[in-house]
């Protein structure tokens, strides 16, 4: 049986993650409070942020920026998107 969480992003019960996706206390919080659906949505946004902003993940500032954007997206109801990103038309 799949683990469910009360996802703070979706504001409803949803399937939880199988394991903490990030190290430390933040990873444990994500595991407790964020659904698989919200995490997958974040991973797509994260990819766009890295690509559109040409972030170098070896740079500590880039990693800090991504962590801030992740927390904003997952826990603060913030809209996060890469500057200049245009979604494909339907």
Curated annotation (Swiss-Prot):
InterPro entries: Fe_traffick_prot_YggX, Fe_traffick_prot_YggX_sf
Keyword line: Iron
Keyword Lipid biosynthesis applies: no
Molecular-function GO terms, alphabetical: iron ion binding
GO biological process: cellular response to oxidative stress
One Gene Ontology CC term in the entry: cytosol
Pfam family, one: Iron_traffic
Iron is among the record's keywords: yes
Cited function: Could be a mediator in iron transactions between iron acquisition and iron-requiring processes, such as synthesis and/or repair of Fe-S clusters in biosynthetic enzymes.
HAMAP family associated with the record: Fe_traffic_YggX
NCBIfam families named among the record's database cross-references: PRK05408.1
Family: Belongs to the Fe(2+)-trafficking protein family.
Protein name: Probable Fe(2+)-trafficking protein
Native source organism of the sequence: Bordetella avium (strain 197N)
